[in-house]
Swiss-Prot record:
Primary localization class, coarse: membrane
Family named by the database record: Belongs to the major facilitator superfamily.
Keyword Transmembrane: yes
GO cellular component: membrane
Record keywords: Glycoprotein, Membrane, Transmembrane, Transmembrane helix, Transport
Record region (Disordered): 1-45
Record-given protein name: MFS transporter cpaT
Its biological purpose: MFS transporter; part of the gene cluster that mediates the biosynthesis of the fungal neurotoxin cyclopiazonic acid (CPA), a nanomolar inhibitor of Ca(2+)-ATPase with a unique pentacyclic indole tetramic acid scaffold.
Length: 496
């Protein structure tokens, strides 16, 4: 968000009298003020907020980025109950009850990211969370599977805001050298949420029925509505400057005020530019395209596991529905280990590289943890696949899932931090493009899971996934060593 640049200033355009054109007349135009921040330490600027205010806001955003991904998987252990209740035995349709939510996650960012540039991040968080709550209530009373699919789709659209805008909010509030911990907290939700979801959903649906899964979601999202309405603050600088300009106009109507040339675009033009920006970045910039593909594969694997682990443990290890949810703890523990290792290393490694680079920061300095981290997901898939294929003790596949969880953190955190640093003011658009791709793959790859495992078995099926993941290893290596040259290449300078 330009935190490294000189902050905006208030510039006054003098009247004719001030320019030495003779005495001022009563009909002379009033002076014009261009509104900016009151110096580099202006406390109204989000990057200068108190530590307490920053982390209150960060905590709420992290809660949202935990809650909305949790909703994607919480119904996974209850797929059988849902289909039984609606008298269907279609396994692909059962998987789609889970994954259609991610179709909404793919559609939502295309609209919510540009709307945040017009109305601010806060308004999108508020309206989106309220509508998200409504769709969860609708899911609890769904009369048939078709209606449930529609409600899940719209819940995904309205719930995609926090994941799309969260990285931009981090960039708003934290200087580049301080973002590592905040990005780790933001990035933890999209991984821990889907892991904890099946644990809660398994026992709750077994005890109270699958509809109570949606009532629980409605309750916890209702709490989120209260937080975003009464505690969360706006952090998007252009919107804050527009608000400041309006406030000055009200207090002194004799002074013409604007919030900078870049902020005077009409809403329609801003919306069109912002809605096309993620598409341009996705198709015209190699870093966004390849890292979006990378995260798409990772999320596709995650949701493929979510939709198949339940059946594997019920049929192979004879777990109850509630106990099956506990299997996902393996991914959660792995994710926590990944956070403690890779989250802590992110800022340290970057600071070392900055010092070696004569104090000059580069986005590519976020990528070193991704290189060793790229081996973890293949290790986990081989471990999980062959453990289940050979019917080895049930703890062994869970350990394999732990490797997968750790690898996902090691993959997603550096990529998100890299995109935020590389695109600055347009970080939300880069993350939106990334979210669209990973959500589409996450929605549709699980549909191929049952037929793939039926043909190849759990061992070779998961090995195939592992080999594909290994094939992506050159991506972070290439961008670490040549990323700046690629970014500076005029062929990839996109007008956004």
């Amino acid at each position: 968000m330009g935190h490294q640049e000189e902050p905006p200033r208030i510039c006054k355009t003098p009247s004719g009298h001030e320019q030495g054109e003779g005495p001022a007349e009563k009909t002379s135009k009033p002076s014009t003020e261009e509104v900016g921040w009151d110096g580099p330490t202006d406390p109204a600027r989000p990057v200068n907020w108190s530590r307490k205010k920053k982390w209150w806001n960060m905590g709420i955003i992290s809660y949202l980025t935990f809650l909305t991904p949790l909703t994607s998987s919480i119904v996974a252990p209850a797929q059988g109950l849902v289909m039984k209740d609606f008298h269907s035995t279609n396994r692909t349709l059962a998987s789609f009850v889970v994954s259609i939510y991610l179709v909404g996650f793919a559609v939502g960012p295309l609209f919510l990211a540009p709307l945040s540039e017009i109305y601010g991040r806060l308004r999108v968080y508020q309206v989106g969370t309220f509508i998200f709550t409504i769709w969860n209530i609708a899911g609890a009373v769904a009369p048939n599977v078709g209606a449930l699919l529609v409600f899940r789709l719209f819940a995904g659209i309205s719930g995609s805001g926090p994941v799309t805008l969260g990285a931009g909010s981090v960039a708003d509030m934290f200087a580049r050298q301080e973002r590592g911990v905040a990005m780790s907290l933001y990035g933890l939700g999209p991984l821990l949420g889907p892991v904890i979801g099946p644990i809660a959903g398994g026992y709750l649906s077994q005890a109270q029925g699958w509809r109570w899964v949606f009532w629980l979601l409605a309750i916890v999202s209702g709490v989120a509505v209260i937080l975003v309405l009464f505690v969360l603050s706006e952090s998007y600088e252009p919107v804050l400057l527009r608000q400041k300009a309006k406030r000055i106009r009200r207090e002194n109507s004799s002074v013409e005020v604007n919030a900078g040339q870049a902020l005077k675009l009409d809403s329609r033009k801003v919306f069109i530019q912002a809605i096309t920006r993620p598409t341009k970045l996705l198709f015209l910039t190699p870093n966004v395209a390849l890292f979006s593909l990378y995260t798409g594969v990772v999320f596709g694997y995650l949701y493929l596991l979510f939709t198949t682990v339940t059946e594997v443990y019920e049929t192979t290890y004879h777990f109850s529905q509630g106990a099956t949810g506990l299997v996902y703890i393996g991914i959660g523990v792995g994710a926590l280990i990944g956070i403690s290792c890779f989250g802590a290393l992110s800022d340290k490694i970057q600071n070392i590289l900055i010092a070696r680079n004569n104090g000059q920061a580069e986005p590519e300095f976020r990528l070193p943890p991704l290189i060793p981290g790229s081996f973890l997901i293949p290790i986990g898939l081989f471990w999980y696949g062959w453990s289940t294929q050979m019917h080895i003790h049930w703890i062994m596949p869970i350990i394999g899932l732990g490797w997968v969880g750790c690898g996902m953190i090691a993959t997603l955190l550096p990529i998100q931090a890299y995109l935020v640093d590389a695109f600055g003011e347009y970080a939300a658009s880069a993350i939106a493009a990334n979210t669209v791709v990973r959500s589409i793959v996450g929605a549709f790859l699980p549909l191929a899971g049952p037929s793939m495992y039926a043909t190849l078995g759990l061992g070779w099926g998961n090995s195939l996934l592992g080999f594909v993941a290994l094939g992506l290893l050159p991506v972070p290596v290439v961008f670490y060593f040549y990323g700046k040259k690629i970014r500076m290449n005029s062929r990839y300078q996109v007008s956004v």
